[in-house]
């Protein structure tokens, strides 16, 4: 099936030069692979067999393509179709209207030409053709939650013409003035629950939902919702399995946009709400989470907002969002990556090469999960692509280190890099400089153990490390600052409020609450110091060219080197000297000193390492 594209879709991109996409950008902006899903309800509900009123009844069978041509089709009002093939999606004129009874009856697809109401057409079902002629069938998809019922009737298409006929299930009227503007009226709307995909009973707590999910969310926000997932916090939520895991069901409620106090704008309530158009500038600074436009308005655009945030353009659009602390904590706990295994059998005692091979391999695996975790931090995907890459490159080793500290908190004297990779201090002596880093890590683990770090505090500190790394420019001459630092500050405020909220509800006295908060935040400076030490050590290992490094780890390492070129470059000079060049496992040649190339202002989202020749992989910046 051929789908005609408009001129705007095939026009060349303007402005941005072509370049190869980096490994980090591919992980950040890669969309999930979608596979066509079978309808959860019987097909008869989506494509009901209908009978037109009057004397005769025309029977339609939409699945096998059968159509009774002998039965007359009579309706309460005449339906029209267009015979002009110039613009299949435009409104037909009065002169191009012909009565449906004056031409052979055939397959018609009734859709709307309005971009807000017209569903997307995609080839999904292919019923057999009639009379040996090719037929076109469409599976009606919408980008939003509601699915609209449309009638699909059979038609004979000429091989030389493409006719897309437009009508509706109800009576359509065309105005006689002008070019014949159509008035589209939707007859029936079937809406589904955004949480479990069951039939929605109404608009509850900011989204369309069923009675079961509405009642479950009401009970959860009114009482204690200390649910625990027995699996990996990724349980499937549908009509049959929604009761199997309360934790994942509540997480799905928050993800689809359920909020306490969500209210439809087109319905009155017990509290009269002031129209936003008359609020003025003061009302747009900070708004409660229940009054947000994209939360309280019915979902019209579906997932359009989530996809537009990664296009690298606008970044944060809209007012500063204030999210409830309970929701922030719940989302951060649900975003935690799963436990990893090294799956590499290396005989002990370790040598320098085997030790660093194990550690760099684990770091590369954790980086992939770290990027997936960062995309689940509340507000992170609303940032521009430049800011996302900047934050990840600035904090990746600190995030990995605090995760290592949390895994090792219950094992004194041990560092748990993975479930099957547990090291102690003595095993770090095989690598020069590694024992010092191990000592600092074990001391920080002991400090967190003494403070009895809670899981809620850990997830908050981890997110603070990610967002605080790019709050201020490391070097104003060599690093481009964040495009929207105010959005990052707003995200930091939400997470800090969540940390304070948890400490205040932990049972500590009023005097101990600010003291504990200060004790936790002061330890982040020690993690930053360990990260700098580890970065210097990794860069020296790369310059020695003894251990193969992976593409993503190399890009992260070199991106951090641009942000703090002084210390890391000095480590490279002390290790190899200015004339040494090392070759990575991917074949790219990198020198420890690049002269003026390391001090230029970095382009938004551009990677430092260019793997291979940028010939066929060049594409516009997304």
Swiss-Prot record:
Zinc finger residue ranges, NR C4-type: 193-213, 229-253
Pfam families: Hormone_recep (PF00104), Oest_recep (PF02159), zf-C4 (PF00105)
Molecular function per GO: androgen binding; DNA binding; estradiol binding; estrogen response element binding; nuclear estrogen receptor activity; nuclear estrogen receptor binding; protein homodimerization activity; steroid hormone binding
Domain of life: Eukaryota
Span list, region Disordered: 1-53, 78-112, 275-319, 565-622
Example of a GO biological process term: response to cadmium ion
Domain NR LBD: 324-560
Other notes: In the absence of ligand, steroid hormone receptors are thought to be weakly associated with nuclear components; hormone binding greatly increases receptor affinity. The hormone-receptor complex appears to recognize discrete DNA sequences upstream of transcriptional start sites.
Biased composition (Basic and acidic residues): 283-296
Top-level taxonomy: Eukaryota, Metazoa, Chordata, Craniata, Vertebrata
Alphabetized PANTHER family for the sequence: KNIRPS-RELATED PROTEIN-RELATED (PTHR48092)
Subunit: Binds DNA as a homodimer. Can form a heterodimer with ER-beta.
Region of interest (Hinge), residue spans: 259-323
Gene that this polypeptide is encoded by: esr1
Bias type Polar residues, positions: 1-11, 35-46, 95-105, 612-622
One Gene Ontology cellular component annotation held by this UniProt entry: nucleus
Family under the similarity heading: Belongs to the nuclear hormone receptor family. NR3 subfamily.
Descriptive protein name: Estrogen receptor
Annotation: DNA-binding region: 193-258
């Amino acid at each position: 099936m051929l789908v005609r594209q408009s001129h705007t879709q095939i026009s060349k991109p303007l402005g941005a030069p072509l370049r190869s996409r980096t490994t980090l950008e591919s992980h950040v902006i890669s969309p999930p692979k979608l596979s066509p899903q079978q309808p959860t309800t019987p097909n008869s509900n989506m494509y009901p067999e209908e009978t037109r009123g009057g004397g005769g009844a025309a029977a339609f069978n939409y699945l096998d393509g059968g159509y009774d041509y002998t039965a007359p089709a009579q309706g309460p009002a005449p339906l029209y179709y267009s015979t002009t093939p110039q613009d299949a999606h435009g409104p037909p004129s009065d002169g191009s209207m012909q009565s449906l009874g004056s031409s052979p009856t055939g397959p018609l697809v009734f859709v709307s030409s309005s971009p807000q109401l017209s569903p997307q057409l995609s080839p999904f079902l292919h019923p057999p053709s009639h009379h040996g002629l090719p037929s076109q069938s469409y599976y009606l998809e919408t980008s939003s939650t509601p699915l609209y019922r449309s009638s699909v009737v059979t038609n004979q298409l000429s091989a030389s013409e493409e006719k897309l006929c437009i009508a509706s299930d109800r009576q359509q009227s065309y105005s006689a003035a002008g070019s014949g503007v159509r008035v589209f009226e939707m007859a029936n709307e079937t809406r589904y629950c955004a949480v479990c995909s069951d039939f929605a009973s109404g608009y509850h707590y900011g989204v369309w939902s069923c009675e079961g999910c509405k009642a479950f969310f009401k009970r959860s926000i009114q009482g204690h919702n200390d649910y625990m997932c027995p699996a990996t916090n990724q349980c499937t939520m549908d009509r049959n399995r929604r009761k199997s895991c309360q934790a994942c069901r509540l997480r799905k409620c928050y993800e689809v946009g359920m909020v306490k106090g969500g209210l439809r704008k087109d319905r009155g309530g017990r509290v009269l709400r002031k129209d936003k158009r008359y609020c003025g500038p003061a009302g747009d600074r900070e708004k409660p989470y229940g009054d947000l436009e994209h939360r309280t308005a019915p979902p019209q655009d579906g997932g359009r907002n989530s996809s537009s945030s990664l296009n690298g353009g606008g970044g944060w659009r809209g007012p500063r969002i204030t999210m409830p602390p309970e929701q922030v904590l719940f989302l951060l706990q649900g975003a935690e990556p799963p436990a990893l295994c090294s799956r590499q059998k290396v005989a002990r005692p370790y040598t320098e090469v085997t030790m660093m091979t194990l550690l760099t391999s684990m770091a590369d695996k954790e980086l992939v999960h770290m990027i997936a975790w960062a995309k689940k931090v509340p507000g992170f995907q609303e940032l521009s692509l430049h800011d996302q890459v900047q934050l990840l490159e600035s904090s990746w080793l600190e995030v990995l280190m605090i995760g290592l500290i949390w895994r090792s908190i219950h094992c004194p004297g041990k560092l748990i890099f993975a479930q099957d990779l547990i090291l102690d201090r003595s095993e770090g002596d095989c690598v020069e400089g590694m024992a010092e880093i191990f000592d600092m890590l074990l001391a920080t683990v002991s400090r967190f153990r003494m403070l009895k770090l809670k899981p809620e505090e850990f997830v908050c500190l981890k997110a603070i490390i990610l967002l605080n790394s790019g709050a201020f420019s490391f070097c104003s001459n060599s690093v481009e600052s964040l495009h929207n630092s105010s959005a990052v500050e707003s995200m930091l405020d939400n997470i800090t409020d969540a940390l304070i909220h948890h400490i205040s509800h932990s049972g500590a006295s009023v005097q101990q609450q600010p003291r504990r908060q200060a004790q936790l935040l002061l330890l982040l400076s020690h993690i930053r110091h360990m990260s700098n030490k580890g970065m210097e050590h990794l860069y020296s290992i790369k310059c020695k060219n003894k251990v193969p490094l992976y593409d993503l780890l190399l890009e992260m390492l070199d991106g951090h080197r641009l942000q703090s070129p002084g210390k890391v470059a000095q480590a490279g000079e002390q290790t190899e000297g200015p004339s040494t060049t090392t070759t990575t496992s991917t074949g790219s040649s990198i020198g420890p000193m690049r002269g003026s190339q390391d001090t230029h202002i970095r382009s938004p989202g551009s990677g430092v390492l260019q793997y291979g020749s940028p010939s066929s992989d060049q594409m516009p910046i997304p």
